Regions:
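Active-site and adjacent substrate-binding regions of carbohydrate-active enzymes
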Residues: 1-407
Length: 407
């Protein structure tokens, strides 16, 4: 069934809304004065009731399930329900002209800010119909996407549809066939797997598939979310996915389950640097591999500065705050100091090289091969070339290029 959240309106009516993500209802913490306003009791009695209500709500009971005196229960339940708040991403009604006016204005504003690429987060949940599934309905998904693209074209914006699904479902191919770039959510886990096993055969296979099928991707190491795992199903054997999970968790990460289901993994939350054991050589190797894989590189700021797992931030965030492990705020002074470190300098060198070399691009040619623990990438374009030869056991790499940029 579709995820429905009942939203209470000021007139007391409960109205159903589609709410795909982060569906949570929060009730207020009551005090004695709140109880005294709705029930004819003295302060001492009101204080006891308030404490009992707060304790039971915190334990997960619904207001209607409270074990308090019947003479005041209806009033207290009404008070709680009237003041409840919601945590969620409310789904918009894509059949409403007002929503499309909002989309148009949003894209116009983003373009005015200088945006060139706009991510469409979880776009495949947008079209819904009673009796249909809640994800990637066809043809509705592609019709909505095309409608957004026409708006984006007015403002010279490129759309980047965001979708998480297992490799075996081939949804990334569907997006590419519709003419869109897509996220390479496979690469972060693949690189960890390659560096931990010393085997680059899966990276080679994936790079060749991207080139042969002309799939244009935006790739990454870490990001504002976790390191994707669900996506790897069908690409990497289950036992190796479990090894990635065990390794990252042993290094201080957290496992995020799919829709809260235990033992149905979705992602692991950790900084990429900590996921690699806070090893500078591994981090630089990972960045070099990213720069030479097909795609447009995206860089998460905390990876660039070799950020470590922020367990204190997770504690401060409370339940559901696992993502804060990889969202540490850095001060200008911290950044200034980190810019002096070798790991930051070398990453910036790699980024500069990837940005200015003519050897790379969606129109370039790539030859990739593995021999034992050695993986080699050779890019050629416009008469220029760039080569990465990387040892996945020692984490040593060598880059050469015809332009003499990387020196």
């Amino acid at each position: 069934g579709l995820p429905i959240l009942m939203v209470r309106f000021p007139d007391g009516k409960n109205v159903p809304y589609w709410n795909t993500f982060y569906q949570e209802i929060k009730y207020p913490v009551l005090d004695a004065q709140d109880i005294m306003q709705v029930a004819k009791v003295q302060y001492y009695k009101a204080d006891l009731i308030a404490k009992k209500v707060n304790e039971e709500i915190a334990a997960g009971k619904k207001p209607s399930e409270l074990s308090i005196d019947t003479f005041c229960k209806d009033s207290v339940v009404e008070l709680l329900e009237s003041k409840r708040k919601y945590l969620g991403q409310m789904d918009l009604n894509i059949k409403s002209p007002l929503v499309w006016e909002f989309y148009d204005e949003t894209l116009k504003t983003l373009a005015a800010y200088g945006a060139k690429i706009v991510r469409l987060d979880a776009f495949a949940y947008a079209p819904k119909e009673p009796g249909e599934k809640n994800f990637l309905n066809e043809p509705g998904t592609w019709e909505v996407l095309e409608k957004v693209r026409k708006l984006a074209d007015k403002y010279n914006l490129t759309l980047l549809p965001e979708i998480h699904a297992s490799y075996g479902e081939k949804n990334y191919e569907q997006i590419a066939k519709q003419g869109y770039m897509t996220y390479d959510f496979f690469l972060p886990g693949m690189i960890i797997d390659a560096l931990e096993s010393g085997n680059g055969s899966t990276l080679e296979k994936w790079a060749k598939e991207l080139m042969e099928k002309e799939i244009h991707v935006v790739n990454m190491l870490g990001c504002h979310d976790g390191i994707p795992l669900l996506d790897l199903k069908g690409l990497i054997p289950e036992e190796r996915i479990q090894q990635i999970i065990d390794t990252v968790v042993a290094r201080g990460g957290y496992v995020k389950d799919l829709h809260g289901q235990k033992n149905v993994y979705y992602q692991v939350n950790a900084t990429y640097y900590s996921a690699l054991g806070e090893d500078d050589k591994k981090m630089l190797m990972a960045r070099a591999l990213q720069m030479f894989m097909p795609g447009k590189p995206q860089v998460w700021y905390l990876d660039l500065f070799a950020g470590k797992n922020d367990h204190e931030a997770v504690k401060r965030a409370g339940a559901g705050g696992h993502k804060e492990i990889n969202r540490t705020n850095l001060s200008a002074a911290q950044i200034e100091e980190l810019m002096k470190t070798d790991i930051v300098k070398e990453q910036l060198k790699l980024l500069h090289f990837r940005n200015v070399s003519k050897a790379f691009g969606f129109d370039a040619e790539l030859a990739v091969s593995t021999e034992g623990e050695i993986i080699t990438f050779i890019w050629t374009n416009q008469g220029e070339s760039a080569t990465l030869r990387a040892n996945l056991k020692t984490f040593e790499y060598e880059i050469t290029d015809s332009e003499g940029i990387y020196a």
